[in-house]
Amino acid sequence: MRQSAGTLLYRGDLEHLEVLLVHPSGAYNRRAPWSIPKGEPGDETDLEETARRETLEETGVAAGPLISLGDIVYKKSRKRVHCYAGPAPLDMEPKCASWEVDQARFVPLAEARTLLHPDQCAFLDRLVEHLQNL
């Protein structure tokens, strides 16, 4: 089974929570859902390192401390996606740092639920649950 790893970086408190999402580039993806910044493992075997690398490559944001939100399996493609969450660095604004994405921005949680790939919405729920338990 193919797999990828990415991050769900956030800022704000539970009432004003925003998460960092990216939109894939290209005419074929014009109406595609948004995603967490993610990618497939390269030479590294550590999935958290893959998530960090892909986030930096796609958004220009270097992730700080991360916790695992587990994984999901896409219903159609059966691809496994591992997600790591952490607070976004306060002084960093995302940018499209890769040809793979045409937008990278923080979006409010409610909006993220409408933009995000439906299978990835479970990561939003897991993030909220984690933050409620802090």
How would you describe each model-predicted region?
Residues V22-H23, P37, G70, A85:
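Residue-level detector of conserved, well-ordered beta-strand and adjacent loop positions
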Residues M1-I36:
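N-terminal strand-loop-strand
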Residues I36-L69:
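The catalytic Nudix box helix
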Residues L116-L134:
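Charged phosphate-binding loop/patch that engages nucleotide di/tri-phosphates or the phosphate backbone
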